[in-house]
């Protein structure tokens, strides 16, 4: 029997193509520095195909031969600092001066694994099973999550705009996960649609924490490579500026903006108090005013003007759902305001007419005693 290195199902080895997913046995990786499917790490994990990759790592589907379960395994691979030939599994430093920086990166990567592992009892945060050093790099073994990232999930909607009610519910679930993370003394630092998994029944899982990225931020590479424009608040662009849980709340506000507007919000550095971004309520006419206000508060340039914590963010979303009129949209607010103004104008006009007529009557009609004197 043969195990498919894409879906990890077992099938008869006489077939070259997996009958479950159609994967062709022996297919090489799309990018030459990715591990070849079938590679074994630590005499335990059989590496499969690539799930995703970025500037700091590659994530593969894998099979844990000891536990007999499908997993995801993330390899630390900072593009620009290392390379790997097709003949070896070991990573090679690109320049002797990068060794200290690279080792610091590995330390941060493994520290991230330990950080995530403390939340293994939580259902809305990815679970870590193992972490190890091998091939002159490091690996994190995590649960394999059936589902898709929010980034991918949004593509099913026209203009990638999610129904408001659904977006609010997902934002509440992310806020709940962030409340747990922050209570554990951790800041995620990388909340974005690509790090939020949508699972069955629209439950969510928070993925990659941003700790492993920090080592590069402290070194020489450009911040534009590290940060995700639109989701990173101003304080993340300044290396000495304090970051706290409000950093994640800005990002969550940006995620909510992305879900309801269909576009990534403007980069923080492009915004000023004098020329701020267009309010989401103007960009989407059926957006309730309270959602507009929540997004703008969460994405305030000054951290002091944002929600103080994730629970406060969630509470605001709950208040909006339960206490605001569902028809309270920006277009209807404008129409309502116009109607109120017109009513006030008419009332003032009627009052003016009443007093005008009364004054004229008093002026033109002589009192009875004056008529008698004149008679």
Predicted segments — roles?
Residues 174-186:
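Protein kinase catalytic-loop region centered on the HRD/HxD motif
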Residues 150-162:
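AlphaC helix of the protein kinase catalytic domain
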Residues 170-171:
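Activation segment signature within eukaryotic-like protein kinase domains
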Residues 135-149, 153:
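Conserved short submotifs of the Hanks-type protein kinase catalytic core
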Residues 230-322:
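C-terminal lobe helix-coil module of Hanks-type protein kinase domains
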Residues 83-119:
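AlphaC helix of the eukaryotic protein kinase fold
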Residues 130-131:
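Activation-segment/catalytic-loop signature of the eukaryotic protein kinase fold
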């Amino acid at each position: 029997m043969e195990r498919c290195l894409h879906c990890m199902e077992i099938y008869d080895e006489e077939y070259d193509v997996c009958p479950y997913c159609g994967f062709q046995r022996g297919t090489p990786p799309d990018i030459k520095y990715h591990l070849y499917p079938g590679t074994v790490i630590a005499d335990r994990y059989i590496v499969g195909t690539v799930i995703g990759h970025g500037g700091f790592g590659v994530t593969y589907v894998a099979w844990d031969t000891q536990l007999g379960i499908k997993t995801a395994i993330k390899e630390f691979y900072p593009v620009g600092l290392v390379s790997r030939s097709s003949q070896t599994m070991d990573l090679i430093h690109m320049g002797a001066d990068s060794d200290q920086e690279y080792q610091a990166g590995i330390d941060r990567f493994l520290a991230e694994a330990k950080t995530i592992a403390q939340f293994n009892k939580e259902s809305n945060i990815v679970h870590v099973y193992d972490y190890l050093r091998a091939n002159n790099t490091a690996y994190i073994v995590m649960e394999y999550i059936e589902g898709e990232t929010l980034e991918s999930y949004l593509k099913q909607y026209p203009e990638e705009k999610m129904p408001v009610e659904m977006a609010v519910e997902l934002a509440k679930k992310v806020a709940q996960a962030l409340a747990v993370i922050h209570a554990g003394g951790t800041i995620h630092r990388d909340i974005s649609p690509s790090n939020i998994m949508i699972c069955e029944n629209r439950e969510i899982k928070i993925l990659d924490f941003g700790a492993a990225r920090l080592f590069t931020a402290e070194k020489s590479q450009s911040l534009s490579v590290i940060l995700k424009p639109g989701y990173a608040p101003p304080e993340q662009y300044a290396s000495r500026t304090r970051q706290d849980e409000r950093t994640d709340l800005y990002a969550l506000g940006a995620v909510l903006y992305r879900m309801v507007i269909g576009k990534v919000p403007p980069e923080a550095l492009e915004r000023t108090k004098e020329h701020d971004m267009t309010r989401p309520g103007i960009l989407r006419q059926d957006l309730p005013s309270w959602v507009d206000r929540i997004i703008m508060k969460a994405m305030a340039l000054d951290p002091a003007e944002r929600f103080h914590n994730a629970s406060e963010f969630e509470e605001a979303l709950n208040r909006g759902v339960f206490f605001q009129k569902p028809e309270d949209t920006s277009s209807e607010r404008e129409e309502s305001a116009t109607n109120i103004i017109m009513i006030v104008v008419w009332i003032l006009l009627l009052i003016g007419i009443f007093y005008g007529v009364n004054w004229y009557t008093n002026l033109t009609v002589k009192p009875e005693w004056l008529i008698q004197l004149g008679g």
